Amino acid sequence: MIRVLHSVSNMDRGGIETMLMNYYRHIDRDKVQFDFIVNKKKPSDYDDEIRRLGGHIYQSPGLDPLHYPAYLRFVQQTVTADPRIRILHAHNEAMGLYALKGAEKAGLQVRIAHAHNIWIVRDYKWPLKMFCILPAFFNALGQAICMECNTVGRI
């Protein structure tokens, strides 16, 4: 069995989270299991169901500029601690770079950067997000972009 580690903000009932749970409910969990790195320090709507389905929830130190070194170490240690984790799938847009880099440092061979939209929120982290967006894309192994009906890819 392999484990896919998803990096998300939290597992409340949002679009990305609900999509992931729909996949999780219908995959063959004897072959593939989902685990989640969450960045918000509060219980989430899907936590109990994730555990019931066999998944793990790893509480990160937070994806905040003050915690980036600790976050990198956390991801690296999480991946290294369970050799069944074979894939990291970052759903954090530009900030997914930190999960991808931590997984790379742990030697993980399959790293996916998944941007669910093209908009980057202009908050206090905006300059850092702009700095991270291209490295996040190129830190993933293989790239694919789909915008409406047009696709561009290098896999």
Predicted feature locations:
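Membrane-interface segments of envelope glycosyltransferases acting on lipid-linked substrates or membrane lipids
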Residues: M1-I155
